[in-house]
Structures are given as structure tokens and as C-alpha cells.
Regions:
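Generic signal for short, ordered secondary-structure residues
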Residues: 16, 67-70, 90, 190, ...
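N-terminal "assembly arms/tails" that initiate or stabilize quaternary assembly
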Residues: 1-62
Length: 269
């Protein structure tokens, strides 16, 4: 199976890996677009003011332009270690065992706006680019969705395994899921005291990170939707078909534990 994660706006600095080399990344069919986007981002960064405007950076984020300017020579680290934030804190890549890293390497991909789909262990540099960022201030310049969607969709269409999409909708549009059985977008819902379910906003990313971690620990070797749902039920997770005619799955968060300022979504009641 392949678990698809969104990236994060925040990223760790540094790294011990050698600079970006496209031939070391998964999904080689994406190399032409990767090369095009990286070149455009680096070129944009040569004009500081234009980059600040195009990337919608605030005064305290101006240093992100230098990050982008340095992409060709910057050190790299594994993708799951590069990204930070709520989802990645919950996934906690730093505590994965060697065996779990092997599972993640073959079963997890991150949807980067800069590099497209990358494997969990692919070496990536620090950068600043979002799915809705502009690569040029020129009128009519191609959006990232326009640049990535065809190649990204083809990369997923070539696969015949189970696809579990935990990306936000903006990033999912950069590589749309194929329209087939076994390709599922996951929506996170919360169950309130009355038993009703509703969209979960604040803890959405956290719940996705916890699910991704559980899948990695479980081996992420499910060959069908039924196998996945059976595993989830056995582990005490409520993962179910949306029942609305789509192929979406719903992940129900039964409760949030902790105290204000230190709350945590729980996937088990």
C-alpha cells in the first residue's frame, strides 16, 4: 500500500545528506517537472522582493527566500525528518525503529510542492513553497497545480496497490488519486457526546499523523480495502467507508484527551 501525506509549512534546518540529486528520489517519472520547478524557485529567490510577494511571506519569514536560493547546494535529510508540525510531531519519525523505517520507505510518500511525490526516506533540502505559491509574478504564469497535476496523477495511476490519501485537498490536487477501487481519500471526523459525528478541524492533522504511525507500526502491507478496515477494527480504530457513494473513508476520533494547552486526539476510545 501507499500512504500519502501532506508536507508542512515548517521544516527542520540543516541535514547531513549531500545536496539535492533528482536521481536519488522516488517516482522518477516526475524528474522533468521537478527540474522545472526547482529552477523556477531558485530563479525567483534571486529577486528577494519578488519572492517575498510570490510566496506571501511576512516580515519574520524573509529568511525563507535564502533557503530557496540555497536549494541546489543545501544539505538534505530524509523527508519524514525534514517536515515538522502537528502531523509530523504525531507521527514522530525520530522514534521509528530501523524496521519501521524500512516499512515507511516503501509505503509512505509526501506530497511536496517543490518535488512532487517523494518517498519517506528520500533526501530533501529545506525550502519554502506551498501548493498555492506562485513561481512568478508575471500574469498568466503556470500555477503549481497546472505544473504538477498531470505528471502527479500519472505517477499514482501507474500503481495498482492500495492508496490511502491523508493529504489536504490543496496538496491532493497536485497528484489526484486515480478513480478506481482501492484508492481512498481519508476525512477525519469527531464524535460528540450525543454520538453525532462532525468535521474535526484543530486535531485533523494530529489524527492523520497518529494513523500514519499506527499503519507503519502495523507493517502497512494491506492488499485491499477490506484488509485495511479489518486491521483498523481489530486495533480499535473506527475507519469506515463514507457511505455517500464516494470512495472516501472516514476516520472517527472518539475523544480528545489532556488539559487545555496540552490536548491530544485519541484514535481509540
Amino acid at each position: 500500500m501507499l500512504i500519502l501525506l501532506p508536507p508542512s509549512e515548517t521544516k527542520r534546518d540543516g541535514g547531513a545528506g549531500s545536496p539535492l540529486a533528482l536521481d536519488r528520489l522516488s517516482f522518477p517519472s516526475l524528474h522533468p517537472v521537478r527540474r522545472e520547478v526547482v529552477e523556477a524557485v531558485v530563479e525567483l529567490a534571486s529577486d528577494h522582493e519578488a519572492a517575498v510577494r510570490a510566496l506571501k511571506l511576512g516580515p519574520k519569514q524573509a529568511g525563507e527566500v535564502e533557503r530557496n536560493r540555497a536549494i541546489p547546494s543545501a544539505p538534505t535529510m530524509r523527508a519524514l525528518e525534514r517536515y515538522t508540525g502537528v502531523l509530523y510531531d504525531a507521527l514522530d519519525a525520530a522514534s521509528l525503529s530501523e524496521a519501521e523505517w524500512e516499512v515507511a520507505s516503501r509505503s509512505v510518500a509526501v506530497q511536496s510542492a517543490l518535488l512532487g511525490l517523494v518517498g519517506a526516506a528520500d533526501p530533501v533540502p529545506a525550502y519554502r513553497l506551498s501548493f498555492d505559491s506562485r513561481l512568478s509574478l508575471k500574469r498568466g504564469a503556470a500555477s503549481l497545480k497546472r505544473r504538477w497535476s498531470v505528471a502527479g496523477a500519472a505517477a499514482l495511476r501507474d500503481r495498482d496497490d492500495l492508496l490511502l490519501d491523508l493529504r489536504s485537498e490543496g496538496y491532493a490536487a497536485l497528484a489526484p488519486l486515480p478513480d478506481r477501487d482501492g484508492a481512498h481519500y481519508v476525512r477525519v471526523l469527531a464524535r460528540d457526546e450525543s454520538g453525532e459525528v462532525r468535521a474535526l478541524n484543530h486535531f485533523n492533522k494530529q489524527a492523520k499523523g497518529l494513523l500514519a504511525r499506527a499503519l507503519i507500526e502495523g507493517g502497512a502491507a494491506f492488499g485491499s480495502t477490506d484488509e485495511l478496515l479489518g486491521w483498523a477494527a481489530g486495533e480499535g480504530y473506527e475507519l469506515r467507508p463514507a457511505g455517500d457513494g464516494s470512495r472516501d473513508l472516514q476516520l472517527i476520533v472518539p475523544e480528545v484527551r489532556g488539559v487545555p494547552g496540552s490536548l491530544m486526539a485519541s484514535l481509540r476510545a
